[in-house]
A protein has these predicted regions:
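Fungal secretory targeting signals
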Residues: 1-23
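Glycine-rich N-terminal segment of FAD-binding domains in flavoprotein oxidoreductases
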Residues: 40, 51-113, 129
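Short glycine-biased active-site loop of nucleotidyltransferases that positions the nucleotide triphosphate
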Residues: 51-55, 96-102, 208, 385, ...
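Structural signature of FAD isoalloxazine-binding scaffolds in flavoprotein oxidoreductases
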Residues: 65, 96-114, 169-188, 216-220, ...
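Short, structural beta-strand-to-alpha-helix junction motif
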Residues: 123-124, 131-138, 156-157, 310
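A gly/ser-rich beta-alpha-beta helix-loop segment of oxidoreductase catalytic cores
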Residues: 143, 147-183, 187
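C-terminal cap/substrate-recognition region of VAO/PCMH-type FAD-linked oxidoreductases
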Residues: 183-184, 188, 193-454
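Activity-critical C-terminal alpha-helical subdomain
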Residues: 439-497
Length: 497
């Protein structure tokens, strides 16, 4: 089923003169910009690269692939001459229909914006939005440096960055967006500007968690960090009956956070034939010191952890867990961590709610449900503030867990059923959090949503602090006064008064 944004894209595109879209494809091609037409192999290949096959079901009239900021500016300027919607595609990992995909409009691919330019003098790297994170990391091979980026190598740079970006390195350096020194941006009027702490600082802050509301980012100048050593990581796999022990270990790990170089993701998966837990582990060194992961190690498991020669090797290994060829829905909730006295009761409620809702749709062909517990310890939030902050502005005096909810399944005929289950899952999760707050089991604190994991129906801007939303809205009006990106892009969380 198309999302509301996807239907909007489809209906408006069909309502407009189809020739207008064909005209802009021809205009851009005449201007020297790479254009992929529906009959081309490159076009077909691009549509198979989405994480969710539902996004690939949407067929743009053509795909434009600019290779520079100047060419991207040309695309944006030419779009003012026609009445058609467009979408921007980076890695295509966001599964929300219409966010990086479009029916009959113009799809703008950033795949040719794929530079990795390292500057050894200030240890920064210019990273293109068209890269995957494994490509970005591989581009730094031999420098002894790394960048704060995705935990799975196949995730794209572009959308990940403007959504904030959670990393295995976040407890050392904050969100990925906190490590950007300079955004190169094409604005709605086609001008190319830079956003830094001192140049267009309002735009600089708003791009760190503000999505696609302000312009098209064509390059990120990022601070790199030392990593001239091997890293350790991999997976532990547990049976589902160990859930209570695992969640206890998650709570304690997040609360005590024994080492800033350590990171985990705890993912429970359920289908008709699968019922288990996969723990992703990472340590920014050849081997974790004794005590860091001991509580997880003590639970019966199978292990594929090892020392990897490079961070790139680990990210490439993690790609095994990016299952393609399926349709995907994704959603999120943010919960404060229960204290030691309360224990894991709220976490176990979240897990049981996931099992209950998932159990109701197990007859859906090929369905696999997952719930991931992603620690957001106090040190993570403090590092984000130390590096200039962001729109999320999460307090550093309270540990949190970011919950990712996920359904993959096979057939479009089941779209409405899985959509309903997704809504039931995240709404119920939010209700459980609030119930525990009302009972005094969880603190009543600010709980923004993590954009990269959010479902299109969720109210991202309604959960951002009033101060951050006010800043973002002022920024949007200053840099896009006519609301070009609000009305002409086919998806994203709209920033309205």
């Amino acid at each position: 089923m198309l999302s509301s944004n996807g239907w909007r894209a489809l209906v408006l595109s069909l309502a407009l003169v189809p020739q207008a879209v064909a005209d802009i494809c021809a205009t851009l091609e005449a201007g020297g910009i790479e254009i992929e037409k529906r009959i081309s192999l490159a076009y077909q290949t691009d549509l198979t690269e989405y994480w969710s096959t539902a996004c690939g079901d949407l067929k743009p009239t053509c795909i434009a692939a600019p290779s520079s900021a100047a060419e991207m500016a040309q695309v944006i300027k030419n779009l003012h001459d026609v009445e058609t919607l467009f979408a921007i595609k980076s890695g295509g990992h966001n599964p929300n229909n219409g966010f990086a995909s479009i029916q009959d409009g113009l799809l703008v691919s950033t795949k040719n914006l794929d530079q990795v330019d390292y500057n050894p003098e200030d240890h920064t790297a210019v990273i293109g939005p068209g890269l995957s994170w494994e490509e970005a990391q591989q581009g730094l091979a031999g420098t002894g440096r790394t960048i704060v980026g995705g935990r799975m190598g196949g995730v794209g740079v572009g959308g990940y960055m403007v959504g904030g970006g959670m990393s295995f390195l976040s407890s050392q350096y904050g969100w990925a967006a906190n490590n950007v020194k300079d955004f190169e941006v094409v604005l709605a009027n086609g001008s190319i500007v830079h956003a830094t702490e001192t140049e267009n600082p309002d735009l600089f802050m708003s791009l760190k968690g503000g999505g696609n509301n302000f312009g098209v980012v064509t390059a990120y100048t990022m601070q790199t960090h030392p990593q001239d050593h091997k890293v350790w990581g991999g997976n532990y796999v547990y049976t589902a009956d160990k859930a209570s022990e695992i969640l206890t270990a998650v709570r304690n790990f997040t609360d005590e956070y024994p080492d800033d170089k350590a990171a985990i993701i705890v993912t429970f998966e359920r289908s008709l034939v699968i019922d288990l837990c996969i723990l992703f582990l990472f340590y920014d060194g050849p081997e974790p010191p004794s005590g860091v992961f001991d509580e997880f190690t003590a639970i019966e498991h199978t292990s594929t952890t090892k020392t990897w020669d490079t961070y790139y090797d680990l990210l490439n290994h993690n790609n095994f867990f990016i299952l393609k060829g399926q349709r995907y829905n994704i959603a999120t909730e943010t919960t404060p961590l229960p204290n030691k006295t309360v224990g894991t009761a709220p976490l176990e409620e979240y897990y049981e709610h996931f099992r209950d809702v998932t159990g109701s749709v197990l007859e859906v062909a090929g369905i696999l449900g997952s719930i991931a517990f992603q620690p957001l310890p106090k040190t993570f939030s403090q590092r984000a503030k130390d590096r200039g902050g962001d729109l999320l502005d999460i307090p550093s005096d309270q540990p949190y867990i970011v919950i990712e909810l996920n359904y993959s399944y096979g057939l479009s005929i089941d779209d409405s059923k899985v959509d309903a289950a997704t809504v039931q899952l995240y709404q119920g999760m939010g209700n459980i959090v609030q119930k525990n707050i009302d009972k005094g089991l969880l603190p009543d604190v600010y709980r923004p949503l993590f954009m990269n994991d959010a479902y299109y129906r969720q109210d991202y801007w309604g959960r951002i602090s009033p101060e951050s939303k006010t800043l973002a809205l002022k920024t949007r009006k200053a840099y896009d006064p006519e609301g070009f990106f609000q009305t002409r892009t086919s998806g994203g969380w709209r920033l309205k008064d």
